[in-house]
Structure formats: structure tokens, C-alpha cells
Regions:
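Catalytic-site signature of metal-activated, phosphate-bearing donor transferases
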Residues: 1-182
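Membrane-interface aromatic/basic loop that binds lipid-linked glycans or pyrophosphate carriers
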Residues: 186
Length: 190
């Protein structure tokens, strides 16, 4: 974590005010550099909270549901998702694909809430975006295109290119898992 974030956390622990939780931005690091463009920066995560005021949803990429007011810290926390290597990252994402498949198949019948998609709370907007995204064909290609071209991942150099490709592969793993789970549910061979 940056020294600025550490000071800010210490101040908030001493004097939280009426906040139940605080969000902070994450800087994803890959190949020795911050992948600012091809990651989802700025993405806010609840990381400092009163345990009695927060519950967590989802098995992978957990979402904090805060009962009370949420503040934001200006500092960043440094995130090293590849500290154990890319093989460990892929292994972890195979598990995430399994969780995503289960969640998506169980909520497939639910309709997209277009109002929340446009003007809802960030967590609900993300949920509706996922619902919409998972109904689109060619998701891996779309994911690469969005991360590398629209979000300008090319500015992150080779790290940005590799990260965008890995995220596209992850989407493909989710697609495969959904197909596999759907076939199993219908009693068809995988």
C-alpha cells in the first residue's frame, strides 16, 4: 500500500466519523508496472469497514453490502494478482469461472433492470451490466476489444496487451463452463 493510503487509514481508524466503511482504489500491477488502462481502474473496493456493518455477496469477486454510510479514501492500494505467476492466476480463474457459471445459470431467467443499469448504485449497475454482458455472443472478443482499444490498454505496453488477452481467455473459460454445466443439467455428455 502507498504511504499516503497508510496515513489515511490510520486517521480513519482513529476517527471514522459516521462512516460504516471506506472504499479505496486499487492499482493492479503486472510485469513490473501499473496496468492503468487495461485494468478496470478506477474501480472502488470496500477494504476498511466495521465488521458489524458489512456483509459479503458472491463467491468470486465478492461484493460488500454496507449497512450505513460509505466514504472514500484518496490513496491507492497496490494489488499484485500475478505475484505467484500466471499459472496460479489461471488456476484461480478456472475456479472463478466455475462460480460465475453457477451464479449466471441460477439468475439467467431474471430480467435486466434497465433503470439500475443506467442510474443505479454502482454495485447494482455492475450486476446488471454482467447480466447484459453474459447474454452477448463473442464475449471474449468484446472483452479484449474493450480493454485493449476502448480503455486504451495499448498504452500499458506489452503488459496491457497480455492482460487484455488473459481477461479474454477468462471470459472464454466462463463460456465453456456455462456450456458444460448446461449440458450436465440436461443430462447430455460434456
Amino acid at each position: 500500500m502507498t504511504s499516503g493510503l497508510w496515513r489515511e487509514i490510520c486517521e480513519r481508524v482513529e476517527n471514522p466519523g459516521d462512516f460504516a466503511a471506506f472504499e479505496m482504489r486499487r492499482q493492479d500491477m503486472f510485469m513490473g508496472r501499473w496496468i492503468k488502462h487495461s485494468s478496470f481502474y478506477p474501480c472502488w473496493f470496500v477494504r476498511l469497514y466495521r465488521p458489524d456493518c458489512v456483509r459479503w455477496e458472491r463467491l468470486a469477486n465478492e461484493v460488500a453490502i454496507v449497512a450505513g454510510k460509505t466514504g472514500r479514501l484518496s490513496g491507492h492500494f497496490l494489488h499484485y494478482p500475478f505475484s505467484k505467476g500466471t499459472a496460479a492466476w489461471f488456476k484461480r480463474h478456472i475456479q472463478y469461472a466455475e462460480f460465475e457459471s453457477r451464479e449466471l445459470l441460477s439468475s439467467r431467467a431474471e430480467k435486466i433492470d434497465w433503470r439500475s443499469l443506467v442510474a443505479g448504485e454502482p454495485q447494482e449497475r455492475r450486476r446488471q451490466l454482467k447480466r447484459l454482458f453474459y447474454r452477448m455472443p463473442a464475449r471474449p472478443l468484446i472483452k479484449f476489444f474493450v480493454l485493449y482499444f476502448l480503455r486504451r490498454g495499448f498504452l500499458d505496453g506489452r503488459a496491457g496487451y497480455n492482460y487484455a488477452r488473459m481477461q479474454a481467455i477468462y471470459e472464454f473459460m466462463i463460456q465453456l463452463r456455462i456450456m458444460e454445466d448446461s449440458r450436465k443439467a440436461r443430462g447430455e455428455p460434456v
